[in-house]
A protein has these predicted regions:
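Cytosolic regulatory regions of ion transport systems
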Residues: 1-215
């Protein structure tokens, strides 16, 4: 369980609060709007109404005590930038800030953000890949050229083993799990045999995935 400071409780921030709650973390939520603060009360440990660009207010929260500080402000980039910078100055261990454009992302990283999340960009990539490909069921966007994909098992692989298809050698794609009857099995070995109805979780580059799975 971690202690999280969440600043900015719009739609994105509220969903972050809900998921952190479901994961069992302690969350202090902050927003300048009382209505937004009240909306997340069922999901957070503590909540405060305040201006996150005010150094005295932020300092009173005990920034150094949090494992991570998430700046989810999406409607005011100036406030997001100032809050990010102040958090770092006050000794935040980890600052994760939301960006809404490539330019915002660069400025946030230069002004104290350890990591930046870009929901619109990430969702756009997910949508483009997921719905333009016949065999990709889901995917997780990682940094760089490599991503994790869940794909349908090609019919020609039914009855074959991981070692026999050897897509790691041919395409640089690693099979990291097999889904059977709705459950993911991560204990994949060279002798693991594929069965009809399986889906597989793979790590690789999209262009190689296209070649391997004829996407």
């Amino acid at each position: 369980m971690k202690s999280i400071l969440l600043i900015g409780l719009g739609r994105f921030g509220k969903h972050v609060a809900m998921h952190l709650h479901n994961l069992g973390h302690q969350v202090m939520a902050v927003d300048s709007t009382e209505e937004r603060v009240n909306a997340v009360l069922p999901y957070v440990t503590e909540a405060q109404i305040g201006d996150s660009t005010n150094e005295s207010f932020l300092s009173s929260l005990g920034i150094r005590n949090f494992d991570a500080c998430i700046v989810a402000i999406g409607d005011n980039f100036q406030s997001s930038l100032e809050t990010t910078s102040l958090l770092k100055e006050l000794g935040a261990k980890l600052v994760v800030s939301r960006a809404s454009s490539d330019v915002h992302q660069k400025f946030l990283l230069r002004n104290g953000a350890d990591q930046v999340v870009y929901p619109e960009q990430q969702l756009a990539k997910w949508t483009a890949i997921r719905f333009s490909s016949n065999h990709i069921l889901d995917f997780v966007n990682l940094e760089g050229d490599y991503d994790i994909y869940e794909v349908d098992l090609p019919e020609r692989w039914v009855g074959m083993s991981v070692g026999e298809i050897d897509i790691r050698k041919k395409y640089g794609i690693n099979i990291i799990a097999v889904r059977r009857n709705g459950t993911l099995d991560f204990s994949v070995k060279p002798e693991t045999v594929f069965k009809d109805g399986n889906t597989i979780l793979v790590l690789g580059q999209y262009r190689e995935l296209q070649k391997c799975f004829k996407i």
